[in-house]
């Protein structure tokens, strides 16, 4: 038999009890029968008593405590013979582990007496049989006494490196109210089966613990009242446990998930943005939308190398930053083995490698090499003079659609050799040589070769001056005259006529005016031989 040293005892988990209140009720007949049966089988108070190695019998101290939901008490021994009431109590063994550990003092009282202090205690079980007996006692207690109002069901995988048998420990959780006690079982890393009764909330918080194996539900975590509820739950088919949508028949394990799904059919959008009044069906969608208004960018690209076009780029959504980070993984991953140039796509690398190799695209006419077929096709059009784009107005065709049409003047005058882009311009020009004047003035009978000249002539008859100068209340028949008048004020006209002392804003106007005095006519018509003082007069003939 191995002895438990004081050092091992000090390192072992501790179990503390909070003060319990007394209760005046006695044991029920079922509990009395259970207690008597257990005592005959070598149990004390419904729990197996196993003395660990190295601990003498005289160090055992039995304590009785009540597990009722409201009032509790601790007494030593059984109920008094003179008492007519039966105390509803269970006996739990408490043992002193080591002298180095602070000695415990249990205030034993009769009825209506609390526990002031309960020392550290630990019950060690080495055999599976004793553990199964303890589990049987716990199950009987659950059926007889409805003390445990809630049972947390879960399953965990047992693992141990020292022993091949699974390792389990028990704990009584008193962090809840007395009417909501939870019995839990958890896995441990110890090399022995440990039974810990921990009722002090201040001592180590533990994860939700497994109940005994017979109470475990392998599929779900549910809060059940007793074993009958668990059996009823296990007997239900999986389809009955889920939540089903009546519209599309889709099933969900949670009612909240079904509620969110049904908003797709009802088009309900209960979450509304206060700024733009846009509605959303889920709160997460509203949170993402609010980042647009606040310009919050919670997701940042932490890449600082040159491969990132925008270092420390921030995104408002995680999907955007993930897409951005993919660019770093794939950015410039294709490298040319000849010149070590790097490309982001394999197609670009293939096109670049053609420049190092023999040009695959070669012109059959002149022998020029090209790395792209599009360049070769464009080059061959020059040799074959292919004119793919035809101009509808004049019937001319061009290699390119834009830019070339205005560089060519296919219409030429036979008399003077002048070229024109449009046929209408050539016809208008030929009227100068032929002297044809189709446009005649109705008032004076004067004829003109162009309609623009006739319109200008009509303004002279009507003295129309549609362009008015607001500052000096003057009007002009031509917009160009108005523009010149606005640019140069009257007092700034520096060109004066010596004969009439008239001022002009431009030197050309002064020279033209002086011809009135000198009667000079420098413009001569080549056909009729007449001379004119102004260019416009020669065109108006």
From Swiss-Prot:
Biological process (GO), any one: regulation of DNA-templated transcription
InterPro entries reported in the protein's UniProt record: Znf_C2H2_sf, Znf_C2H2_type
Main location: nucleus
Annotated region (Disordered), positions in chain: 1-22
Gene3D superfamilies in the cross-refs: Classic Zinc Finger
ZnF start-end (C2H2-type): 243-265, 271-293, 334-356, 361-383, 411-433, 439-461, 495-517
Domain of life where this protein originates: Eukaryota
Subcellular localization: Nucleus
Swiss-Prot/TrEMBL keywords: Metal-binding, Nucleus, Repeat, Zinc, Zinc-finger
Single GO molecular function: zinc ion binding
Keyword Repeat (UniProt): yes
One GO cellular component term noted in the UniProt record for this chain: nucleolus
Biological function: Probable transcription factor.
Subunit structure: Interacts with VAV1 and CDK4. Interacts with INTS13; promoting association with the integrator complex.
Family assignment from sequence similarity: Belongs to the krueppel C2H2-type zinc-finger protein family.
Protein name: Zinc finger protein 655
């Amino acid at each position: 038999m191995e002895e438990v040293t004081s050092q091992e005892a000090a390192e072992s988990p501790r179990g503390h009890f909070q003060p319990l209140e007394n209760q005046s009720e006695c044991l029920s007949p079922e509990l009395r029968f259970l207690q008597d049966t257990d005592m005959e089988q070598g149990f004390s108070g419904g729990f197996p008593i196993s003395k660990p190695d190295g601990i003498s019998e005289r160090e055992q101290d039995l304590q009785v405590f009540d597990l009722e939901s409201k009032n509790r008490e601790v007494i030593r021994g059984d109920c008094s013979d003179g008492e007519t009431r039966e105390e509803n109590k269970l006996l739990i063994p408490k043992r002193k582990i080591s002298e180095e550990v602070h000695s415990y003092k249990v205030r034993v009282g009769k009825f209506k007496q609390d526990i002031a202090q309960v020392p550290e205690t630990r019950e060690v079980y080495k055999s599976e049989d004793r553990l199964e007996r303890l589990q049987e006692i716990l199950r009987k207690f659950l059926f007889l006494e409805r003390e445990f109002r809630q049972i947390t069901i879960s399953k965990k995988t047992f693992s141990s490196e020292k022993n091949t048998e699974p390792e389990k420990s028990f704990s009584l959780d008193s962090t809840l109210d007395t009417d909501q006690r939870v019995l839990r079982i958890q896995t441990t890393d110890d090399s022995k089966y440990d039974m810990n009764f921990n009722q002090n909330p201040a001592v180590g918080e533990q994860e939700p613990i497994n109940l005994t194996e017979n109470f475990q539900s392998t599929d779900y975590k549910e809060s059940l009242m007793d074993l009958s509820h668990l059996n009823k739950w296990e007997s239900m088919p999986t389809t009955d446990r889920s939540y089903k949508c009546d519209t599309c028949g889709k099933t969900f394990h949670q009612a909240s998930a079904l509620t969110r799904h049904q908003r797709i059919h009802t088009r309900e959008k209960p979450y509304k943005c206060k700024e733009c009044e846009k509605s959303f069906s889920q709160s997460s969608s509203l949170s993402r939308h609010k980042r647009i208004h606040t310009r919050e960018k919670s997701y940042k690209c932490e890449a600082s190398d040159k491969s990132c076009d925008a270092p420390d780029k921030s995104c408002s959504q995680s999907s955007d930053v993930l897409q951005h980070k993919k660019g770093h993984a794939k950015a410039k991953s294709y490298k040319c083995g000849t010149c070590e140039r790097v490309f982001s796509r394999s197609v670009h690398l293939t096109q670049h490698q053609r420049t190092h190799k023999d040009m695959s695209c070669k012109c059959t006419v002149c022998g020029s090499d090209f790395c792209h077929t599009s360049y070769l096709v464009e080059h061959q059009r020059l040799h074959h003079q292919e004119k793919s784009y035809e101009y509808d107005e004049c019937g001319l065709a061009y290699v390119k659609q834009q830019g070339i049409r205005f560089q060519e003047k296919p219409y030429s005058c036979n008399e003077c050799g002048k070229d024109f882009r449009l046929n209408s311009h050539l016809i208008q020009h030929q009227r100068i040589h032929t002297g044809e004047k189709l446009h005649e003035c109705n008032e004076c009978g004067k004829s003109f070769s162009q309609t623009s000249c006739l319109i200008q002539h009509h303004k002279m008859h009507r003295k129309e001056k549609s362009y008015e100068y607001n500052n000096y209340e003057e009007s002009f028949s031509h917009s160009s005259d108005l523009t010149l008048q606005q640019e140069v004020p009257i007092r700034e006209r520096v060109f004066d006529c010596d004969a009439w002392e008239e001022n002009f804003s431009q030197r050309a106007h002064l020279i033209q005016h002086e011809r009135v005095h000198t009667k000079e006519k420098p413009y001569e018509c080549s056909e009729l031989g007449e001379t004119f003082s102004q260019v416009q007069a020669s065109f108006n003939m």
